[in-house]
């Protein structure tokens, strides 16, 4: 234990003179001397009750002793027979336990988290014991309050603020709200009271028992002003009245306060669960809610003005960088995102701060600095209050109390303590300003050039001149003014509330300032105003862009780079949330993590709610697509990686859709009984084309076929028994339905299943044996070509191995070179006649001569031609790796393979970027001449010459 500092050793002599006789100096331990020197409250309490010191020395405070509070208090109240006795025992118990807590805190015997827990649970124990004693007494006097069914009605108490959060400070008011479940009357009393009268009278007595000062002090100062309608409202409300108030009249600050609300005592009873469920939608909105930030900023402004008005300097709670700002930071995230992130719904600050860090809403460094600062400030606050059991957060100005705090906080002197305090509060202030801002930063923000505000609010005419647009060409200037005027006209047709108008008037000058700084201002503004038209009636999204300048900047740069992204954001504004975090926006999910991410995402949605499941799948896909496109635009993803990500994303979707369809089918029909003898589901999805070849683009559809290995005689084992093969057919139909159903977030993917045996005329799902037989005996050469780019994208190991074996067998069949060459060439010529050359003086990157399809046909031809001799050629299904294999197996010269690979990736890269620009896949005739010449030469060499 750290020895007392010099000023405190001198003060000890004063303490000794005050001590009563039973507490002789020589009988006191070093610990007792330290605590008695530090705290006048402990000194006075132990002087009045010397036996408490004996108890402290023989049974030192423990971190977990809060678990005994209920039993200890029950024992203390066991002989209480009247209200006066109740008040006396509650006060003595509170004082005795507070001395134990002060002892543990002063000597740092337990962590600060434990101190907060003990203080909070002590208050809860005292409140609940007082309530229960009074409820029994009131029931004896007036009868038991009951509902219409005769069921007894309890008084439920909501602990608010730090009490609710389990973070009560040493000397604190307690904020309470009283409620009872249902209307009715008392039964069994001398005269009947309605429940409102019963609980109001009981509530008044409870406040008196806790709050009224006596010769033993008080238990807690009780503050009831957080209840609906404040001091002018009823003291106790029914659940129905509470619900009506919060739904119809609940204000932002009340929502803020309700985050920490906790039901005191038995929190798992039926009525407690009902009350909790009733309040949750008010506190945690289903959608991300950015109105919170302005509300909290307004509250912070009020507090800052109050601090200035009352001259509250050196206030560690309300001052800049103080405890309140840490609470605001945490609650911003809770109120904005708590409805969608259950981990943010904790009432306690530290667990919520951990969840914020885990969700990457704050950097690890910022979160850790806030955690350390919070614990430092809370310890300092509690030590300060425990000196005199006084509710204060203002640092002392006298030398004695400064010396006390420096010693207890483990600093050599007061300047060292204040230096550390300043560092912590500076860290808090920095994070607070970045997130919420204050009056000063708002003033700077509002000082944005008045000309931009005029440009927006006056909607200047086309022939007006404005200096802020002077740098643009005359055409662009006219176009910008027209776009602004048209946008304002469009707004007049929409129903936008006063809050929406206010946010828009704040947002637009900033947006115009940023957009018009660009050379492509007119084009970018046209895309963004089209997006804004779609969201102006949804203030939440406007607030997002208004409150987060970084999100606005990302929106502008992405819309400038890609009309496809602008269209996606306009169609699905939920995606705007992705703009908040540049770390994830430009960093797509790891290719092997899509399945896990999607699984986690779907856990938020009830498994049995098909509509929400479908919506969640589509929202996940769109968010991931946005990230991939953003990384593509930023140049952090090369073309091959773009396709890899799009393909992995599609596979994760297929996985989830099959899972959903399977669960639904099994619930309806049971499982096919042949699965009892084997692992897996006996089902596979084979991806062809771009999916099979790892070459998906942004708007690619999925070429799929479905396989099963169900015997002819298999049946399902459910109550509604059906033929096993019929089960797999319905499963495939269900999968197609889940992909193609149009929800408010669109469809998932266009799916084309025409590559199955016999095409559109064939069965939607095929047995593995029938597929093998068809490929061996009926398939055309072009179907074998398609098989080159096919692979299982979902399926159990048995079926996957079977398909791979069939594919390998078909591809390694010996083929007559000339015949194969002719068939492949003629098929390509038919395709070209059908698809290519539709745009005069343009080059169709995919379909025209020298384009992507020619390269694909070259690789397919060479695999089918030489796989009989070189089976390794069957290993991969994508063109780039097939070209590598052709070089490695001495079919094609390495230089040619590399040149074709470069041409192929260059052309595909262009297709990706055209898609981002929402442009068709053709370019000027004089583009890519070198690549086309190279491809033509290879075509001639392999598919024309003998």
Swiss-Prot record:
The ranges of region (Adenylyl removase) come to 1-440
Q: Give the E.C. number(s).
A: 2.7.7.89, 2.7.7.42
Name the InterPro entries for this protein: GlnE, GlnE_rpt_dom, NT_sf, PII_UdlTrfase/GS_AdlTrfase
| Keywords, comma-separated and alphabetical | ATP-binding, Magnesium, Multifunctional enzyme, Nucleotide-binding, Nucleotidyltransferase, Transferase
| SUPFAM superfamilies found in the cross-reference section | Nucleotidyltransferase (SSF81301), Nucleotidyltransferase substrate binding subunit/domain (SSF81593)
Q: State whether keyword Transmembrane applies.
A: no
Q: Where is the signal peptide?
A: none
Some GO term, biological process aspect, for this entry: which one? regulation of glutamine family amino acid metabolic process
Going by the record, the broad EC class of this enzyme is transferase
Identify the GO cellular component terms for this protein: cytosol
**MF (Gene Ontology):** [glutamate-ammonia-ligase] adenylyltransferase activity; [glutamine synthetase]-adenylyl-L-tyrosine phosphorylase activity; ATP binding; magnesium ion binding
Function description: Involved in the regulation of glutamine synthetase GlnA, a key enzyme in the process to assimilate ammonia. When cellular nitrogen levels are high, the C-terminal adenylyl transferase (AT) inactivates GlnA by covalent transfer of an adenylyl group from ATP to specific tyrosine residue of GlnA, thus reducing its activity. Conversely, when nitrogen levels are low, the N-terminal adenylyl removase (AR) activates GlnA by removing the adenylyl group by phosphorolysis, increasing its activity.
Entries under PANTHER family matching the protein: BIFUNCTIONAL GLUTAMINE SYNTHETASE ADENYLYLTRANSFERASE_ADENYLYL-REMOVING ENZYME, GLUTAMINE SYNTHETASE ADENYLYLTRANSFERASE
The record's comment on protein family reads:
Belongs to the GlnE family.
The protein in question is named: Bifunctional glutamine synthetase adenylyltransferase/adenylyl-removing enzyme
Q: State the organism of origin.
A: Escherichia coli O7:K1 (strain IAI39 / ExPEC)
């Amino acid at each position: 234990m750290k020895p007392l500092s010099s000023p405190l050793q001198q003060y000890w002599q004063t303490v000794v003179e005050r001590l009563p006789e039973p507490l002789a100096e020589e009988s006191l331990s070093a610990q007792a001397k330290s605590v008695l020197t530090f705290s006048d409250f402990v000194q006075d309490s132990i002087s009045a009750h010397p036996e408490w010191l004996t108890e402290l020395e023989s049974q030192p405070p423990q971190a977990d002793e809060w678990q005994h509070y209920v039993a200890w208090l029950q024992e203390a109240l066991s002989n209480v027979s009247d209200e006066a006795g109740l008040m006396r025992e509650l006060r003595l118990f509170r004082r005795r336990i507070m001395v134990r807590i002060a002892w543990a805190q002063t000597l740092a015997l337990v962590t600060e988290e434990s101190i907060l827990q003990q203080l909070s649970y002590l208050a809860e124990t005292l409140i609940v014991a007082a309530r229960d004693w009074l409820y029994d007494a009131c029931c004896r006097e007036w009868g038991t309050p009951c509902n219409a069914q005769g069921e007894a009605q309890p008084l439920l108490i909501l602990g608010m603020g730090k009490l609710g959060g389990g973070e009560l400070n040493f000397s604190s008011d307690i904020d309470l709200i009283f409620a009872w479940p249902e209307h009715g009357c008392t039964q069994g009393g001398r005269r009947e009271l309605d429940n409102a009268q019963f609980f109001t009278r009981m509530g008044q007595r409870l406040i008196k028992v806790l709050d009224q000062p006596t010769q033993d002090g008080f238990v807690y100062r009780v503050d009831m002003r957080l209840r609906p309608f404040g001091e002018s409202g009823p003291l106790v409300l029914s659940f129905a009245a509470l619900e009506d108030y919060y739904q119809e009249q609940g204000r932002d600050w009340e929502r803020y306060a309700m985050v920490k609300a906790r039901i005191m005592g038995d929190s798992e009873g039926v009525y407690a669960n009902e009350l909790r469920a009733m309040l949750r939608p008010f506190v945690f909105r289903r959608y991300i809610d950015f109105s919170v930030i302005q509300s909290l900023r307004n509250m912070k402004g009020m507090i800052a003005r109050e601090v200035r008005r009352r001259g509250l300097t050196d206030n560690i709670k309300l001052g800049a960088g103080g405890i309140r700002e840490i609470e605001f930071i945490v609650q911003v995230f809770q109120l904005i995102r708590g409805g969608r992130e259950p981990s943010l719904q904790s009432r306690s600050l530290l667990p919520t701060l951990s969840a914020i860090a885990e969700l990457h809403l704050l950097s690890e460094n910022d979160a850790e600095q806030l955690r350390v600062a919070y614990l430092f400030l809370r310890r300092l606050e509690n030590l300060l209050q425990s000196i005199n059991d006084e509710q204060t957060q203002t640092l002392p100005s006298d030398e004695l109390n400064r010396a006390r705090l420096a010693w207890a906080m483990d600093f050599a002197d007061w300047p060292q303590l204040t230096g550390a305090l300043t560092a912590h509060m500076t860290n808090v202030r920095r994070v607070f300003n970045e997130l919420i801002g204050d009056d000063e930063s708002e003033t700077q923000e509002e000082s944005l050039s008045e000309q931009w505000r005029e440009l927006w609010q006056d909607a200047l005419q086309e022939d007006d001149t404005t200096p802020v647009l002077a740098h643009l060409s005359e055409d662009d200037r006219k176009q910008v003014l027209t776009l602004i005027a048209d946008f304002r006209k469009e707004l007049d047709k929409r129903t936008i509330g006063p809050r929406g108008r206010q946010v828009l008037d704040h947002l637009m000058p900033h947006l115009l300032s940023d957009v018009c700084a660009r050379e492509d201002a007119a084009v970018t503004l046209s895309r963004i105003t089209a997006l804004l038209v779609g969201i102006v009636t949804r203030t939440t999204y406007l607030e997002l862009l208004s409150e987060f300048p970084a999100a606005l900047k990302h929106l502008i740069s992405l819309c400038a780079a890609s009309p496809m992204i602008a269209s996606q954001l306009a169609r699905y504004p939920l995606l705007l949330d992705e703009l908040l975090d540049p770390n994830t926006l430009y960093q797509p999910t790891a290719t092997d993590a899509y399945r896990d991410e999607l699984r986690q995402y779907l856990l938020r949605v009830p498994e049995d709610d098909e509509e929400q499941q479908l919506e969640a799948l589509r929202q996940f896909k769109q968010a991931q697509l946005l990230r991939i496109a953003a990384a593509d635009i930023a140049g952090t993803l090369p073309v091959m990686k773009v396709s890899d990500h799009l393909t992995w994303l599609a596979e994760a979707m297929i996985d989830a859709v099959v899972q959903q369809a399977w669960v639904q089918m099994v619930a309806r029909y049971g499982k096919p009984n042949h699965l009892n003898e084997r692992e897996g589901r006996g089902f596979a999805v084979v991806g062809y084309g771009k999916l099979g070849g790892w070459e998906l683009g942004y708007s690619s559809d999925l070429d799929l076929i479905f396989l099963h290995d169900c015997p002819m005689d298999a049946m399902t084992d459910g109550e509604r028994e059906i033929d096993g093969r019929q089960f797999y057919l319905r499963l495939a139909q269900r999968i197609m339905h889940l992909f193609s159903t149009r929800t408010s977030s669109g469809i998932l993917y266009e799916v084309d299943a025409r590559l199955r045996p016999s095409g559109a005329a064939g069965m939607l799902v095929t047995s593995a044996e029938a597929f093998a037989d068809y490929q061996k005996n009926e398939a055309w050469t072009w179907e074998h070509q398609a098989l080159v780019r096919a692979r299982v994208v979902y399926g159990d190991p048995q079926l996957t191995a079977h398909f791979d074996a069939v594919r390998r067998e078909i591809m390694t069949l010996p083929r007559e070179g000339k015949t194969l060459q002719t068939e492949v060439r003629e098929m390509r010529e038919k395709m070209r006649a059908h698809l290519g050359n539709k745009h005069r003086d343009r080059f169709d990157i995919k379909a025209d001569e020298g384009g992507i399809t020619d390269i694909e046909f070259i690789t397919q031809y060479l695999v089918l031609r030489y796989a009989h001799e070189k089976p390794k050629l069957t290993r991969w299904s994508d063109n780039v790796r097939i070209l590598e294999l052709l070089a490695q197996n001495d079919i094609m010269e390495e230089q040619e393979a590399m040149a074709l690979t470069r041409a192929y990736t260059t052309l595909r890269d262009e297709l990706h970027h055209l898609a981002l620009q929402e442009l068709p896949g053709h370019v000027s005739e004089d583009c890519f001449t070198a690549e086309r010449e190279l491809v033509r030469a290879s075509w001639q060499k392999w598919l024309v010459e003998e």
